[in-house]
Protein backbone atom coordinates (compact mmCIF):
# COMPACT_ATOMS: atom_id res chain seq x y z
CA UNK A 1 0.00 0.00 0.00
CA UNK A 2 1.34 3.42 -0.97
CA UNK A 3 1.94 5.88 1.85
CA UNK A 4 3.31 8.83 -0.14
CA UNK A 5 2.94 9.60 -3.86
CA UNK A 6 4.61 12.57 -5.56
CA UNK A 7 3.14 13.58 -8.91
CA UNK A 8 5.08 15.97 -11.16
CA UNK A 9 6.43 17.61 -8.01
CA UNK A 10 8.59 20.72 -8.35
CA UNK A 11 10.29 21.98 -5.19
CA UNK A 12 12.14 25.13 -4.17
CA UNK A 13 12.27 27.96 -1.66
CA UNK A 14 12.14 31.77 -1.61
CA UNK A 15 10.84 31.83 -5.17
CA UNK A 16 13.72 29.69 -6.47
CA UNK A 17 13.02 26.37 -8.20
CA UNK A 18 15.49 23.69 -7.10
CA UNK A 19 14.23 20.36 -8.53
CA UNK A 20 11.55 19.63 -11.11
CA UNK A 21 9.40 16.64 -12.04
CA UNK A 22 9.75 14.33 -9.05
CA UNK A 23 7.51 11.30 -9.51
CA UNK A 24 7.60 8.48 -6.98
CA UNK A 25 5.56 6.14 -4.85
CA UNK A 26 6.71 5.12 -1.37
CA UNK A 27 5.01 2.01 -0.02
CA UNK A 28 4.68 0.78 3.54
CA UNK A 29 7.94 -0.82 4.65
CA UNK A 30 10.08 0.74 1.90
CA UNK A 31 13.58 2.00 2.68
CA UNK A 32 14.27 4.94 0.37
CA UNK A 33 17.76 6.42 0.17
CA UNK A 34 17.86 9.99 -1.21
CA UNK A 35 21.18 10.86 -2.83
CA UNK A 36 22.64 13.78 -4.77
CA UNK A 37 25.37 16.40 -4.68
CA UNK A 38 25.53 19.15 -2.05
CA UNK A 39 22.90 21.78 -2.79
CA UNK A 40 20.99 19.48 -5.15
CA UNK A 41 17.76 19.81 -3.17
CA UNK A 42 17.69 16.76 -0.90
CA UNK A 43 16.85 18.65 2.30
CA UNK A 44 14.39 20.84 0.38
CA UNK A 45 12.61 17.67 -0.76
CA UNK A 46 12.40 16.40 2.81
CA UNK A 47 11.12 19.73 4.16
CA UNK A 48 8.49 19.77 1.41
CA UNK A 49 7.29 16.29 2.43
CA UNK A 50 6.99 17.55 6.00
CA UNK A 51 4.98 20.61 4.94
CA UNK A 52 7.70 22.99 6.12
CA UNK A 53 7.99 24.27 2.54
CA UNK A 54 5.14 24.47 0.01
CA UNK A 55 5.52 22.71 -3.37
CA UNK A 56 6.25 25.04 -6.28
CA UNK A 57 3.92 22.86 -8.35
CA UNK A 58 2.66 19.30 -8.52
CA UNK A 59 1.19 17.20 -5.73
CA UNK A 60 2.16 15.23 -2.65
CA UNK A 61 -0.52 12.71 -1.69
CA UNK A 62 -0.64 10.86 1.64
CA UNK A 63 -2.32 7.46 2.03
CA UNK A 64 -2.59 4.67 4.63
CA UNK A 65 -4.18 7.18 7.01
CA UNK A 66 -0.88 9.08 7.17
CA UNK A 67 -0.92 12.70 8.32
CA UNK A 68 1.95 15.19 8.16
CA UNK A 69 2.10 15.44 11.95
CA UNK A 70 2.47 11.65 12.21
CA UNK A 71 5.82 11.58 10.41
CA UNK A 72 8.90 11.09 12.58
CA UNK A 73 11.70 13.48 11.62
CA UNK A 74 15.38 13.45 12.51
CA UNK A 75 16.91 16.68 11.12
CA UNK A 76 20.57 17.46 10.64
CA UNK A 77 22.11 18.42 13.96
CA UNK A 78 23.39 21.94 14.55
CA UNK A 79 25.86 23.07 17.20
CA UNK A 80 22.95 24.65 19.11
CA UNK A 81 21.08 21.33 19.18
CA UNK A 82 24.19 19.48 20.35
CA UNK A 83 24.42 21.82 23.35
CA UNK A 84 20.73 21.61 24.29
CA UNK A 85 20.39 21.68 28.12
CA UNK A 86 17.65 19.07 28.67
CA UNK A 87 17.61 15.50 29.95
CA UNK A 88 17.48 12.55 27.58
CA UNK A 89 14.05 11.59 28.92
CA UNK A 90 12.67 15.09 28.32
CA UNK A 91 13.90 15.14 24.73
CA UNK A 92 12.56 11.67 23.89
CA UNK A 93 9.19 12.42 25.53
CA UNK A 94 8.86 15.64 23.51
CA UNK A 95 8.42 13.46 20.43
CA UNK A 96 4.94 12.56 21.74
CA UNK A 97 3.65 16.15 21.61
CA UNK A 98 1.64 15.65 18.43
CA UNK A 99 -0.38 12.91 20.14
CA UNK A 100 -1.55 15.16 22.99
CA UNK A 101 -4.15 17.15 21.07
CA UNK A 102 -5.55 19.75 23.47
CA UNK A 103 -4.37 17.83 26.52
CA UNK A 104 -1.78 20.01 28.34
CA UNK A 105 0.21 17.21 30.02
CA UNK A 106 1.88 13.97 29.03
CA UNK A 107 -0.31 11.03 29.98
CA UNK A 108 0.72 7.58 31.17
CA UNK A 109 0.59 6.14 27.65
CA UNK A 110 2.96 8.80 26.25
CA UNK A 111 5.39 8.27 29.12
CA UNK A 112 5.30 4.51 28.63
CA UNK A 113 5.86 4.83 24.89
CA UNK A 114 8.86 7.10 25.48
CA UNK A 115 10.26 4.50 27.90
CA UNK A 116 9.70 1.78 25.29
CA UNK A 117 11.56 3.78 22.65
CA UNK A 118 14.49 4.44 24.99
CA UNK A 119 14.64 0.70 25.67
CA UNK A 120 14.54 -0.08 21.93
CA UNK A 121 17.40 2.35 21.28
CA UNK A 122 19.30 1.04 24.34
CA UNK A 123 19.53 4.44 26.04
CA UNK A 124 17.40 3.83 29.14
CA UNK A 125 20.50 4.08 31.32
CA UNK A 126 21.04 7.60 29.96
CA UNK A 127 17.51 8.87 30.69
CA UNK A 128 18.55 11.29 33.46
CA UNK A 129 21.72 12.47 31.76
CA UNK A 130 21.94 15.92 30.19
CA UNK A 131 21.80 15.67 26.41
CA UNK A 132 24.80 17.93 25.84
CA UNK A 133 27.01 15.63 27.94
CA UNK A 134 26.53 12.70 25.54
CA UNK A 135 28.73 11.50 22.70
CA UNK A 136 27.68 12.11 19.10
CA UNK A 137 26.47 8.54 18.68
CA UNK A 138 24.45 8.68 21.90
CA UNK A 139 22.89 11.99 20.87
CA UNK A 140 21.77 10.51 17.55
CA UNK A 141 20.16 7.57 19.33
CA UNK A 142 18.28 10.02 21.55
CA UNK A 143 17.02 11.98 18.54
CA UNK A 144 16.04 8.76 16.76
CA UNK A 145 14.06 7.65 19.83
CA UNK A 146 12.36 11.07 19.83
CA UNK A 147 11.47 10.69 16.13
CA UNK A 148 10.04 7.22 16.79
CA UNK A 149 7.79 8.66 19.50
CA UNK A 150 6.14 10.78 16.80
CA UNK A 151 5.25 7.92 14.46
CA UNK A 152 4.31 4.27 14.02
CA UNK A 153 4.52 4.52 10.24
CA UNK A 154 7.31 6.56 8.64
CA UNK A 155 10.67 8.13 9.54
CA UNK A 156 12.43 10.92 7.64
CA UNK A 157 16.14 11.02 8.44
CA UNK A 158 18.38 13.86 7.24
CA UNK A 159 22.06 12.82 7.45
CA UNK A 160 21.62 10.61 10.55
CA UNK A 161 25.30 9.55 10.57
CA UNK A 162 26.82 12.99 10.02
CA UNK A 163 29.80 13.53 12.33
CA UNK A 164 29.91 9.92 13.54
CA UNK A 165 32.99 7.71 13.34
CA UNK A 166 32.95 4.55 11.22
CA UNK A 167 31.93 2.23 14.06
CA UNK A 168 29.07 4.46 15.22
CA UNK A 169 27.99 4.96 11.61
CA UNK A 170 27.66 1.21 11.07
CA UNK A 171 25.79 0.82 14.38
CA UNK A 172 23.34 3.56 13.36
CA UNK A 173 22.72 1.99 9.93
CA UNK A 174 22.06 -1.41 11.53
CA UNK A 175 19.71 0.17 14.04
CA UNK A 176 17.72 1.94 11.31
CA UNK A 177 17.57 -1.27 9.26
CA UNK A 178 16.28 -3.18 12.29
CA UNK A 179 13.52 -0.60 12.85
CA UNK A 180 12.56 -0.88 9.18
CA UNK A 181 12.61 -4.69 9.15
CA UNK A 182 11.10 -5.54 12.53
CA UNK A 183 8.67 -2.67 13.06
CA UNK A 184 7.75 -2.24 9.37
CA UNK A 185 8.38 1.50 9.64
CA UNK A 186 9.04 3.14 6.28
CA UNK A 187 12.40 4.93 6.05
CA UNK A 188 13.24 7.94 3.86
CA UNK A 189 16.87 8.84 4.47
CA UNK A 190 19.30 11.43 3.09
CA UNK A 191 22.96 10.48 3.30
CA UNK A 192 26.25 11.60 1.78
CA UNK A 193 27.61 8.16 2.66
CA UNK A 194 26.09 6.66 -0.47
CA UNK A 195 27.72 3.24 -0.29
CA UNK A 196 26.85 2.68 3.37
CA UNK A 197 23.30 3.99 3.08
CA UNK A 198 22.49 2.03 -0.07
CA UNK A 199 23.47 -1.27 1.54
CA UNK A 200 20.13 -1.47 3.34
CA UNK A 201 17.93 0.55 0.95
CA UNK A 202 15.13 -0.94 -1.13
CA UNK A 203 14.79 2.13 -3.39
CA UNK A 204 16.95 5.03 -4.55
CA UNK A 205 15.92 8.61 -5.34
CA UNK A 206 18.68 10.54 -7.08
CA UNK A 207 18.07 14.29 -7.02
CA UNK A 208 19.86 16.70 -9.34
CA UNK A 209 19.53 18.01 -12.88
CA UNK A 210 18.04 14.61 -13.63
CA UNK A 211 15.71 12.91 -11.16
CA UNK A 212 15.91 9.11 -10.99
CA UNK A 213 13.64 6.93 -8.85
CA UNK A 214 14.25 3.19 -9.04
CA UNK A 215 14.48 0.05 -6.96
CA UNK A 216 18.04 -0.38 -5.71
CA UNK A 217 18.60 -3.33 -8.02
CA UNK A 218 17.48 -1.43 -11.13
CA UNK A 219 19.43 1.67 -10.11
CA UNK A 220 22.66 -0.27 -9.60
CA UNK A 221 22.17 -2.19 -12.84
CA UNK A 222 21.72 1.06 -14.78
CA UNK A 223 24.67 2.69 -12.95
CA UNK A 224 26.93 -0.25 -13.83
CA UNK A 225 25.82 -0.08 -17.45
CA UNK A 226 26.54 3.66 -17.62
CA UNK A 227 29.99 3.11 -16.09
CA UNK A 228 30.85 0.37 -18.57
CA UNK A 229 29.70 2.45 -21.53
CA UNK A 230 31.68 5.43 -20.27
CA UNK A 231 34.85 3.40 -19.79
CA UNK A 232 34.64 1.80 -23.25
CA UNK A 233 33.89 5.00 -25.10
CA UNK A 234 30.26 4.12 -25.74
CA UNK A 235 27.42 6.58 -25.77
CA UNK A 236 26.54 8.08 -22.42
What positions do the PLM features span?
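Conserved ABC ATPase signature
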Residues: 130-134, 138
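Catalytic Walker B motif of ABC-type/P-loop ATPase nucleotide-binding domains
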Residues: 155-158
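Conserved ABC ATPase "signature" region
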Residues: 108-126
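Conserved ABC transporter NBD signature motif
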Residues: 58-69
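H-loop (His-switch) and adjacent beta-strand-loop-beta switch element
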Residues: 202-216
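H-loop/switch region of ABC-family ATPase nucleotide-binding domains
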Residues: 191-192
Amino acid sequence: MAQIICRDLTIGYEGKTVVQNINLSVKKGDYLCVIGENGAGKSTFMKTLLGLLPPVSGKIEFYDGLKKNEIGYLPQQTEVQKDFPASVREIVLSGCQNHLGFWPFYRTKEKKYAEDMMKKLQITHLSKRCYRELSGGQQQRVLLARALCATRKILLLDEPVSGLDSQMTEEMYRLIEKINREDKITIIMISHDIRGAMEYASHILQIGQKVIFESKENYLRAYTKRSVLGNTGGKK
